[in-house]
A protein has these predicted regions:
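Conserved "landmark" site that anchors the functional core of diverse proteins
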Residues: 1-297
Length: 297
């Protein structure tokens, strides 16, 4: 009926095609995505709708069972309030309306049986950067639902902490190109707050904050990128790559956000402050040579 600012079909992602220049894509908040499928007893990897900042309205054609997870958007079924993280049974013709969440960015509408659009390269995910996968749903579109799994849901509701906040602290591992930046730049990254800007999307969160000064001039040859990379363009403000990031890039990556923290990064809406802290798994940062020592080598 209505799709809001941005609604796409997403699953666990498109694996094994980076050598062809095709990224993984998939649900930006993998934790909320997985919870929707667990609530519905769907097989892992079943496709859902990823809804950015609410605004979605759908009407059931035939009885369906659904669940909404992620950003806690106000829900109404035929005008009556409904709960997130809960199994909802929609009779034929029922309308589910999703408002704008107070916090967080992305909500996930799962349906028992999964959204059964044709897969592309083994995935039903829409990659907005590469233009692969199903077209984003439009008003009036009919989305097919796959056969219901044999297993029945074990619970009707799964309590989950709210996603999204005014500030998030994300763990990082330095590198692989932290030596392209001054010591002061690395200290700045690990001690400053960066704000998510409105120019952010599924490709990456563009951040506003202290500029990271380079210790080297010139540019790198293009090299592989991963979700969580903090790439620093010439302007000095980092970009945090998310689900639809490019497969390669030529700007240096000063650090990479730990994969376990990426779901929280994906829920950071414009205006959210991000802080970065060194992951305990990374150990103590090595003592790096000063700029003079590097220049005298």
């Amino acid at each position: 009926v209505a799709t809001g600012p941005m609604t796409t079909v997403q699953d666990a992602g498109r694996f094994g095609h980076a050598d062809l220049g095709v990224g993984r894509s998939g649900a930006a908040d993998a934790d909320s995505y997985a919870l929707a499928n667990r609530l519905l007893a769907n097989p892992p990897g079943s496709a859902v709708l990823e809804v950015t900042l609410g605004g979605l309205r759908v009407r059931a054609r035939g009885p369906v069972t659904v669940a909404v997870t992620g950003a806690e958007a106000p829900l109404r079924v035929d005008g009556r309030g409904a709960a997130v993280n809960t199994v909802l049974h929609l009779p034929d013709g029922a309308e589910l309306a999703m408002g704008v969440p107070d916090r967080g960015l992305r909500s996930y509408l799962g349906v028992r049986g999964g959204v059964d659009v044709p897969p592309v390269l083994g995935s039903r995910s829409t990659d907005v950067l590469a233009g692969l996968g199903p077209e984003p749903p439009v008003s009036g579109a009919l989305l097919p639902v796959g056969p219901a799994p044999a297993d029945l849901p074990n619970v009707d509701h799964a309590p989950a902490p709210p996603v999204g906040g005014s500030e998030e602290v994300l763990r990082v591992v330095l590198g692989p190109r932290e030596d392209w930046f001054t010591d002061e730049a690395v200290r700045t990254l690990l001690s400053s707050a960066y704000e998510v800007t409105p120019r952010s999307d599924r490709v990456g969160a563009r951040l506003s904050g202290p500029v990271l000064e380079r210790a080297r001039s010139g540019e790198l040859p293009s090299e592989g990128m991963v979700a969580g990379s903090l790439q620093v363009p010439p302007g000095g403000e980092p970009v945090l790559f998310l689900a639809d990031h490019p497969v390669t890039g030529g700007y240096p990556v000063v650090a990479v956000v730990c994969s376990a923290d990426l779901p929280r990064a994906a829920q950071a809406r414009p205006g959210t402050r991000l802080r970065f802290t060194l992951s305990a798994a990374a150990g103590t940062p090595p003592v790096r040579p000063t700029r003079n020592e590097r220049q005298n080598r």
